[in-house]
Amino acid sequence: MRKKQTLILALLTVFTSLCHAQTTRFAMTLSTDLGLAGKNYKIVTPNVSATYDLTPKLSVGARVEDAITLAKIQGVKTYDYLATLGGQVSYDAFRILTMINVQPRLIVGHTIGGGHDRGYMYCQGGIYLKADRKNGVMSEIGFGIRHNNYRGDLYKDKTSFFVSYGFVLR
């Protein structure tokens, strides 16, 4: 499983780097999301995404994340470490102070491997704020809601609020 994660990350990095030499319509984002759903469930998802601007405001992309889940089930503390692969759509809705883009974003993904009981599909929607620049490194922050729909009976489906911080390389 670790080789699969490394391979996907390497392919996304190479793909984004090669395309960056041709145009700035491609971007790569490195970020971490922290999901909070009460004291018995937390999820941390370091992730990387490669996006392509279809129009000046609309972009689509692929996303890979390492989902680290910390849970307390019937008094027993457990953790899970799974990789997910998904896609995202975002739209630059408007600007604040002519230098900050407000961007609603929808992300959908599924776990890679991990067995039947541990796997899940997730849907995440949020509002992200980032600098309105065409090139260089920009920081972004975001917040929203994430829902994990587990396939097995090991975990119950969870909805959590999340905050995100990352860097956009364009």
Identify what each model region corresponds to.
Residues 33-45, 73-79, 110-121, 150-158:
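Solvent-exposed loop/turn segments connecting transmembrane beta-strands
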